[in-house]
Amino acid sequence: MTSSLSRPSGRRADELRKVALTRHYTKHAEGSVLVEFGDTKVICTASVVERVPEFLRERGQGWLTAEYGMLPRATHTRSDREAARGKQTGRTQEIQRLIGRALRAVFDLEALGPRTINIDCDVIQADGGTRTASITGAFVAAHDAVSKLIAAGKLARSPITDHVAAISVGVYEGAPVLDLDYAEDSRCDTDMNVVMTGAGGFVEVQGTAEGVPFSRAEMNALLDLAQAGIGRLVQLQKDVLGADHV
């Protein structure tokens, strides 16, 4: 890390934004969380449906899927609702599939039984890192939904096998940095999103050079940064769940 690096936010290269996870944010969903990464704010809900998609009928297992969207004025300028346009963008489809894959990586779907957990991630304010914030918050929402199933006697044990969280990293002004906000993300040389389990396994790595190719050494440095950051996020998840951890 270079000591001369000046991030727009004034953070150190390895410093997360202020992260907050507020549980039980809405009253109807089985699990709900407001996740905040600095000025990025996402409402994550987990809803339980006592059925599975057609392709899983008679398989004796459950399913977890995700949807993602942004409010029209979540960004600097208003965007039309995708429902009004009649179709989702490729970006939206990519992100919601990523969220679903990330959470399924830490779920025993057979132990979940023949039911579906629907994750909804709605971005109410975007300042970079909405997909990584969504994954980190959605895990806690899904955990609370599972806790309610156990309390209701619908599950004998938790189907959750580990924690999962995600963070962005990038090369900004020639230096690897953790948790990019919009000001950095829009000007970085490399942008990477990393999803990992609490045990340190990689679920997904999405990395792109924005004009300037990155070296193997830079990639290793970015992954090291991401692993350390995700470790702190997993600890925050555990702290927030506290005695309710299943």
Swiss-Prot record:
Its EC number is 2.7.7.56. CDD domains: RNase_PH_bact. It comes from the Bacteria. GO terms for molecular function: 3'-5'-RNA exonuclease activity; tRNA binding; tRNA nucleotidyltransferase activity. Phosphate binds at residues 91, 129-131. Keywords: Nucleotidyltransferase, RNA-binding, rRNA processing, Transferase, tRNA processing, tRNA-binding. It catalyses: tRNA(n+1) + phosphate = tRNA(n) + a ribonucleoside 5'-diphosphate. GO terms for biological process: rRNA catabolic process; rRNA processing; tRNA processing. SUPFAM superfamilies: Ribonuclease PH domain 2-like, Ribosomal protein S5 domain 2-like. Pfam families: RNase_PH (PF01138), RNase_PH_C (PF03725). Phosphorolytic 3'-5' exoribonuclease that plays an important role in tRNA 3'-end maturation. Removes nucleotide residues following the 3'-CCA terminus of tRNAs; can also add nucleotides to the ends of RNA molecules by using nucleoside diphosphates as substrates, but this may not be physiologically important. Probably plays a role in initiation of 16S rRNA degradation (leading to ribosome degradation) during starvation. PANTHER family: EXOSOME COMPLEX COMPONENT, EXOSOME COMPLEX COMPONENT RRP41. Belongs to the RNase PH family. Homohexameric ring arranged as a trimer of dimers. This is Ribonuclease PH. It comes from Burkholderia vietnamiensis (strain G4 / LMG 22486) (Burkholderia cepacia (strain R1808)). The gene is rph.
